[in-house]
Amino acid sequence: MDNYVARVGYRHPYILMTDHHFYSTVIAMNDHVTSAVLQHGLIGDTRFFSPVRATYFFAWSKKSAFLINSEKTVDAGTYKFSKLMNLNPEHNVETFVDAKRVLLILSSSKTSEQISHRMEPLLSLQKHFGFRLLIKMHPGSLFSSDELRTAVSTCDVELYKEEKIETIDFDFAFIEQSTAALDVACLGIPFIVVDETFDSYFSEYKELLPTACSSEELLRLAVDFSLSKYMPAYMSFLEREIDNGQCRVDSLIHHLQSECLTTYGGRYDR
């Protein structure tokens, strides 16, 4: 890997998705390399992010920078959420009753029993309100296709996995605690977080966001849902997690590029 870096040169910064895999660690710890890690995913277990081995860690927000707790951390924002916040949803429902296409985003449910448990209250709502139910699996999850087929074998649902959330046609969402909540919030589409744990990343939001800790609570929140009631909560959520979609990554990378050229010029470039 050191030979690879030497061939590529040092006049350009190395932008990494992580500095905790073998090859990325080798690059990040090279004394001549200027590198930056782009935050990828929520800062839950900090062992996946700390210590910061790269020159810099580009965090999504002030909150993420605080969680990383390193002098190398920069509040940089992210392209993804900045882009999503500029999109306008085709649907804008005020209540759950108005929803025509409801998306369930799975993250922690993996076995057929877990998936069936998660779907049960939604199927009850579907029977009562007549909406179309869509299910999206986390693209990086270890879902078994057989387990999923078993869970939905008798249900009228649409299945998604690799598709980007913004390409799916839906107007309401139920989300098992994951980064997907940010995607949906950026799109301006109402959602309810489903979180039956007590120590998840989203625990701090249980008094703010509509959060279902049980099937019974999910049913109640859905029936009583009002977008006007929760819109301030969604906006506060975006402010805390991604600084309302502000993105400085471009300018920061240009700055790193200038630093590299000033420091190394052509000395290490082929």
Name each region found by the language model.
Residues 1-81:
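Active-site and donor-binding regions of nucleotide-sugar-utilizing enzymes
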Residues 75-150:
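Conserved catalytic-core segment of nucleotide-activated headgroup transferases in glycan assembly
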Residues 69-71, 75, 152-153, 179-243:
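Catalytic binding pocket for nucleotide-activated donors in carbohydrate/polymer assembly enzymes
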Residues 108-117, 208-270:
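Leloir-type glycosyltransferase catalytic cores
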Residues 27-31, 68-70, 122, 144-155, ...:
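Short, aromatic/basic amphipathic alpha-helical patches
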Residues 139-187, 191:
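Donor nucleotide-activated moiety binding/catalytic core segment of transferases
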Residues 13-22, 39-40, 56, 59-62, 101, 105-110, 171-174, ...:
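Structural motif
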